[in-house]
């Protein structure tokens, strides 16, 4: 249950959050038993489940796509979890996100371990019980089946997935190129090297402009719980 107030709102305890933001008219929804450290940031359409924790310096931001974090999840120091317009983030229960991990627009099932420095890209799906070890990468639109393992520094790419050491550049690129990173993430057609970045940054800047309208929520303000 969320900590209800009259009208179906939720109270934020004084001093519990450092930077809690309304973004695009959406406010975070945080279970009364969850904890967010004083230097963490929670922005926009973010839902945190029972007994979950977001630690110091972590950022959880819904930039056009919602972020759902289940029960008893741990998001550790300086991790980033980012929902994207076409790729919301859904994280199941009992998921551990270690420091400096980066997750954007992905689906994480229950009981997944994401080690320090791991990266999971847009459209990826990690099956229950999977592990991505230190500096491992799960690339765009990649699917890991239940109990999969990405070793230290290796790259998982494709569906069906291949899990490869990082030095196998040519094989990784052969699998990655058809997944169309610029088109999937930025809506930009792939062109010659160096020609896509101006349009990608222009489009991304337009989306990020919405943050100018963010409203910081003070301690004790109420969070709207829809429905």
Describe each model-derived feature in a short phrase:
Residues 70-74:
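A short glycine/small-residue-enriched secondary-structure motif
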Residues 2-25, 63, 77-78, 84-91, ...:
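Glycine-rich hexapeptide-repeat left-handed beta-helix
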Residues 2-53, 57-59:
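Extended, small-residue-rich solenoid/repeat segments and analogous flexible loops
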Residues 48, 66-69, 88-91:
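Sequence/structural signature of small/polar-enriched beta-strand/turn repeats
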């Amino acid at each position: 249950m969320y900590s209800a107030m009259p009208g179906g709102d939720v109270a934020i305890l004084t001093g519990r959050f450092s930077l809690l933001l309304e973004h695009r008219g959406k406010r975070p929804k945080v279970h009364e038993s969850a904890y967010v450290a004083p230097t963490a940031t929670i922005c926009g359409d973010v839902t945190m489940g029972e007994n979950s924790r977001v630690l110091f310096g972590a950022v959880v931001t819904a930039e056009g796509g919602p972020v759902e974090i289940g029960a008893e999840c741990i998001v550790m120091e300086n991790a980033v979890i980012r929902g994207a317009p076409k790729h919301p983030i859904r994280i199941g229960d009992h998921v551990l996100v270690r420091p400096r991990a980066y997750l954007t627009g992905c689906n994480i099932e229950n009981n997944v371990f994401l080690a320090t420095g791991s990266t999971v890209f847009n459209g990826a799906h990690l099956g229950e019980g999977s592990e991505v070890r230190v500096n491992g990468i799960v690339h765009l639109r990649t699917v890991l089946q239940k109990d999969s393992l990405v070793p230290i520094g290796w790259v998982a790419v494709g569906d069906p997935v291949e899990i490869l050491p990082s030095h196998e550049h040519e094989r990784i690129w052969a699998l990655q190129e058809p997944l169309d990173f610029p088109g999937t993430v930025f809506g930009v057609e792939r062109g010659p090297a160096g020609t896509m970045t101006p349009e990608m940054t222009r489009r991304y800047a337009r989306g990020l402009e919405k943050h100018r309208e963010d409203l910081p929520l003070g301690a004790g303000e109420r969070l709207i719980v829809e429905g």
